[in-house]
Amino acid sequence: MKKTLSVLFTAFSFCVIGFTQVAFAADLDNGEKVFSANCAACHAGGNNAIMPDKTLKKDVLEANSMNGIDAITYQVTNGKNAMPAFGGRLVDEDIEDAANYVLSQSEKGW
């Protein structure tokens, strides 16, 4: 009985991990589309056309405590300084997907 439960649990875990990775990849694809349509005008290539020292590069995100999904989604939703708020214009899922895309690109070096 224990062995059967162990095998079932292991199989279930692999299924969950597999589905999560597929969903995450799809989220990055959507995030890229959302970013291209809404963010790239100011942040093309991870740069910042308005405030050149506030790029989306990994080291700058870390230095400004913006290297997490919550921090990025909060700023995108609410805006800050010259950055407009996108809450109300974009659904939460699109904002989160764009945040995941930004973090993914920052890890790759844009």
From Swiss-Prot:
<keyword id="KW-0934">Plastid</keyword>
<comment type="subunit">
    <text>Monomer.</text>
</comment>
<dbReference type="GO" id="GO:0009055">
    <property type="term" value="F:electron transfer activity"/>
</dbReference>
<keyword id="KW-0602">Photosynthesis</keyword>
<dbReference type="InterPro" id="IPR009056">
    <property type="entry name" value="Cyt_c-like_dom"/>
</dbReference>
<protein>
    <recommendedName>
        <fullName>Cytochrome c6</fullName>
    </recommendedName>
</protein>
<dbReference type="GO" id="GO:0015979">
    <property type="term" value="P:photosynthesis"/>
</dbReference>
<dbReference type="GO" id="GO:0009543">
    <property type="term" value="C:chloroplast thylakoid lumen"/>
</dbReference>
<dbReference type="InterPro" id="IPR023655">
    <property type="entry name" value="Cyt_C6"/>
</dbReference>
<keyword id="KW-0793">Thylakoid</keyword>
<comment type="function">
    <text>Functions as an electron carrier between membrane-bound cytochrome b6-f and photosystem I in oxygenic photosynthesis.</text>
</comment>
<dbReference type="InterPro" id="IPR008168">
    <property type="entry name" value="Cyt_C_IC"/>
</dbReference>
<keyword id="KW-0249">Electron transport</keyword>
<keyword id="KW-0813">Transport</keyword>
<dbReference type="Pfam" id="PF13442">
    <property type="entry name" value="Cytochrome_CBB3"/>
</dbReference>
<keyword id="KW-0150">Chloroplast</keyword>
<feature type="binding site" description="axial binding residue">
    <location>
        <position position="43"/>
    </location>
    <ligand>
        <name>heme c</name>
    </ligand>
</feature>
<keyword id="KW-0408">Iron</keyword>
<feature type="signal peptide">
    <location>
        <begin position="1"/>
        <end position="25"/>
    </location>
</feature>
<dbReference type="InterPro" id="IPR036909">
    <property type="entry name" value="Cyt_c-like_dom_sf"/>
</dbReference>
<dbReference type="GO" id="GO:0005506">
    <property type="term" value="F:iron ion binding"/>
</dbReference>
<feature type="binding site" description="covalent">
    <location>
        <position position="39"/>
    </location>
    <ligand>
        <name>heme c</name>
    </ligand>
</feature>
<feature type="binding site" description="axial binding residue">
    <location>
        <position position="83"/>
    </location>
    <ligand>
        <name>heme c</name>
    </ligand>
</feature>
<feature type="binding site" description="covalent">
    <location>
        <position position="42"/>
    </location>
    <ligand>
        <name>heme c</name>
    </ligand>
</feature>
<keyword id="KW-0732">Signal</keyword>
<keyword id="KW-0479">Metal-binding</keyword>
<dbReference type="GO" id="GO:0020037">
    <property type="term" value="F:heme binding"/>
</dbReference>
<comment type="similarity">
    <text>Belongs to the cytochrome c family. PetJ subfamily.</text>
</comment>
<keyword id="KW-0349">Heme</keyword>
